[in-house]
Amino acid sequence: MARKQSVIVVGAGVVGLLTAHELSRAGFAVTLVERGLTGREASRAAAGILSTLFPWRSPRPLALLSRWSQSSYAMLADDVRRASGIDPEWTASGLLCFDLSEREAAQGWAQTTGRAIDFLDAHEVRKQEPALAEHARPAIFLPGIAHIHISRFLRALREALLNEGIPIKEETAVTGILESGGQAQGVRTEAGELRADHVVITAGAWSAGLVASFGIQLPVEPVRGQIIQFKGPPGLLGRVLCQGERYLLARRSGEILVGSTREMVGFDKDITTEAREELTRVAGELLPVLKGASPMRQWSGLRPGSPEGIPYIGSHSKLKGLWFNTGHYAYGVTLAPGSARLLADLMAGRPPILDPVPYKPDR
């Protein structure tokens, strides 16, 4: 029997975890390497909304990848639940967007794509969300939007991979890529060298620094996003609420998340009073019962910003055997299933789910 091709996946966020899963299913021998603990960077800081919020604004490559991923999430969440015993709480919630200036663009998008959309008056919004009471106002309704409990999803993915026999080397920082004759040979870590036929970079905001020594200029940079959390009763809110790049969602437990900021501050992950005050104000506007309430938690994560938010998926011409799945900006959770499948298709030589050209790392 032929030896399996070996792969080292660098970075164990949601993109790295699903990449490892898809590559294992494609017949590769996979090892996942993580500088810290699984899913503790941008993935853990995400709200878990499985949408780009304003899908009609998305460039075509982002829209196609998002649509493929969204269509796969319900089955993926169920598969992961059965494989791990942990329910990631995939929830088909729908989304209410209060930016009525987007109506014409949203209507055109729906007609072009065939996606369901509705325009609700204040009375119809109040019927859907009684908690808004007299504060209900007209909205654009996207019934196909879902969300997932990201912490539970990350735990479930980690457990599922371990149950598949995929090694996860945590607290193992990669310091360089091993190379010989223009071919990636593995990685150098603080604990020693790890050899493999292929190396996949899924390190989010830290991706560019891992390959700069090869003259690869990957335009991925950190963008800080901060989120606050309130405690509410279960069932208070069913839909995701969205206005002006800000959102609010309620988990099944009653936790209410409000986000998010987008700050160019380098690798600074500090939380700020300014963000807390701004998001608290937004919370009171979107859900008036939160006016005057104090958030119980605040956190931040560094998203891997890239031009137009279009990720880099595929190989790079400067080093054979080096692959990328990074640069998803604020949509890593949304795009992870499709990104992982597309990369696995390319590495396995299968017909790809989407045209890979728009995502090329050396585009």
Model-derived segments and their meaning:
Residues 86-97, 107, 111-164, 261-266, ...:
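Helix-loop-beta segment of a Rossmann-like dinucleotide-binding subdomain
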Residues 287-363:
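C-terminal catalytic lobe of FAD-dependent flavoproteins
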Residues 140-198:
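Helical element adjacent to the flavin cofactor pocket in flavoenzyme catalytic cores
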Residues 18-26, 35, 48-50, 76, ...:
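Active-site substrate-recognition segment that forms the wall
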Residues 48-128, 245, 282-284:
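Dinucleotide-binding Rossmann-like beta1-alpha1 core, especially the glycine-rich loop
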Residues 9, 13-14, 37, 205, ...:
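Residue-level detector of alpha-helix initiation sites
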